[in-house]
Amino acid sequence: MKINVIRGTHQFGGNAVKVTSDSGSAIVLDFGAEFAVNGGRAIVAEGITAGKPGVLGVLISHSHKDHAGLIHTILPRVPVYMDRIAGRIYRTYSEVTGRPEAAAAGKMKALPPLCGKIEFGDITVTPFLSDHGTYRSEMFLAEADGKRLLYTGDFRLHGLLRSELLSGLGSLRGTVDLLITEATCAGRGDEYSTYVPSERTLEKSVLEFLGKSPVILFCSIINIDRIAGLSGLVRDRGGRVFVSWAEKRVIDEAAADDAPPAAFYSNLSIPETYDSSLFSDVRAGDLIFTSSFEDFRILSGMIPSAELVFTEWPGNLAHMNSAFREDPRFHVMHVSGHAHPAELREFAEFLLPRAVLPVHTSSPEKCAELLEGFRVLPLQDGEDFTL
């Protein structure tokens, strides 16, 4: 089995990993858009975006654009796969946000259910549950030529699905030849885990605010687990939950079939537009979700009694003026979707792979230090490695 990281050995986002069996069967794991800070470059790859089709499929681990955002550039005859519900959510998200990959997202094929198998030539792939703050994030086990690799996509161990993630992978312990793991936080030090709260910490803090005030909470439109969890807690306490029409469209996709039960959303009030009369009776215990910086600002002025909770990466605060950020009601509670340094070590010790290949990182050398005792591969983008 041959591994080639098309992009991702020395940068965040824009992941793409090619896996080829000895007989020539090939697949690609993720095909993400590069962040603007890295240049926003497309991927030009023979057999994937150019020339004749040379891979049997592209598998997307989760619905973030840095892992799925270039699917519209893939050759039409190369099928793209994603979890069934996650794919529908990504299609809807792409439509409501005007993403260029919206049409391609609507044509994706569904992967089998968790722990089901799908074959691409002589490569067998099994999806496993992950936790990244997007509904149905997945890890992929690829098997060929008597070898096994596990590709994590993005993951964390401080989310709501920690126990389910680890228990699902328990049978793989000690059997994985290569762990291809995200290492976003590898260079940030152990102190990182002390100032990034868990999802449970966030829920506790929001409930404390709701005990005395309404709360306006900024989070990603596709963070269904967070929206569902907080909505359920608010509902149980007799509060109301407000979302915009865009969030409602995504929620409708998540509430279908075997996704989170619709009861989570039974008390939602859905404003088409924000106006002062809609929020005239907002009271303590009510929760307003938004994923729009402009709406966050407008709502904060319309509801002066509300606490303002920002749960995304603090670097995104550059979109807001300093006066807004200095409002005493404003609280940054970023719950990372990425494994803390200690969690990267914990995960490797749990899985016991024979070798580790860090991706989605600007600090692969830090990952090698963090995973002392494990064989960590220092690959470059475009470099082949044979298991």
Provide a role label for each language-model segment.
Residues 2-59, 65-212, 216-225, 229, ...:
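His/Asp/Glu-rich metal-coordinating catalytic cores
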Residues 64-66, 85-87, 113, 246-248, ...:
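Short, polar loop motifs at secondary-structure junctions
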Residues 78-88, 180, 240-249, 308-312, ...:
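Short internal beta-strands
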